[in-house]
Swiss-Prot record:
This is ESAT-6-like protein EsxL. Keywords: Secreted, Virulence. Strongly interacts with EsxK to form a heterodimeric complex under reducing conditions. The complex is regulated by the redox state of EsxL. Belongs to the WXG100 family. ESAT-6 subfamily. GO terms for cellular component: extracellular region; peptidoglycan-based cell wall; plasma membrane. It holds the Pfam family WXG100. Induces apoptosis of host cells. Is immunogenic with highly specific seroreactivity towards TB patients' serum. InterPro entries: ESAT-6-like_Myco (IPR009416), ESAT-6-like_sf (IPR036689), T7SS_ESAT-6-like (IPR010310).
Amino acid sequence: MTINYQFGDVDAHGAMIRAQAGLLEAEHQAIIRDVLTASDFWGGAGSAACQGFITQLGRNFQVIYEQANAHGQKVQAAGNNMAQTDSAVGSSWA
């Protein structure tokens, strides 16, 4: 009996997570544009409150990006490790 694992699917999933992390930058910029459009709420685009909000938003997006990218890397590494182990075990049975 042969068991076929789709390790490429695991790698592709990890790559997708990392790609989605990269797409966060475009979303971040869109939110900043919206914040600047509504900057009167904070007292104007140059106000300390508006700039502080934008800074905090940037920090939050950076943390999310780093975590998503790291998770994608771990998923890809796990898939690669499983594939290597499977290959080693499979060749020892031949």
